[in-house]
Amino acid sequence: ALPIFLDGNLLSENEKAMYRNVSMYMEDAESSFSINLLCQYLYRYYGKKVIVLLDEYDTPMQEAYVHGYWDTFTSFLRSLFNATFKSNPYLERAVLTGITRVSKQSIFSDLNNLNVITTTSDEYATYFGFTEQEVFQALEEFGLADKKELVKQWYDGFTFGNHTNIYNPWSITNYLDKKKIGAYWAATSSNTLINSLIQQSATDMKEKMEILLQEKEILVTFDEQIVFEQLQQDKNAIWSLLLASGYLKVLEVEQRGIL
């Protein structure tokens, strides 16, 4: 608990009691409004509206889908997002990051003024990873200038919008720290949903997977918006997930929605 909220007269006794009651065991109705209240208290103390940063917003959604409590969880999340991002007069702005672009109809239907940036967007493209210039400069500063080609072979390959040669920050920082090549990113991600869809996929999808394993190109139709309720029926959903997760990159867009 933050002393600024519990000491003095910033909060009333009822508000202090509500603040103390925040826990993983609280009721959903209270929990969904808790960030809104925190924004209110911070505004009262600092006199400024609050910026909310929410990382990996889609991770619990994937878990809810895989483990069978999707409807219950999305109902709660919709209430949480409404209270936090829409009916919150103390909010300056918010940034949500995640791997998948969840369909607006799932949890964002009540929100306005959303600016969605994806792997195919040019906006902020160079900020989702390290550029080659940044990586090579770091290698020189760490006395690893002779490892540029090796690092490029291992960690180059991401494309955001029209920007190619984007490097994974986690892999690069780990390499600079340990000075040893390794698949650092592979140990950090959960692929439960992707694995499930691949196992249930049709033969033609598996044939395309074999083509990819031969380092060849494929042409597929995809929609960057993930509609979890339709994953089992949408045979192209796996490509959307693989693209968003960084396993695929766009080489050429023939028309919107074509990879």
Where are these regions (language model features)?
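Phosphate-binding site recognition
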Residues: 1-259
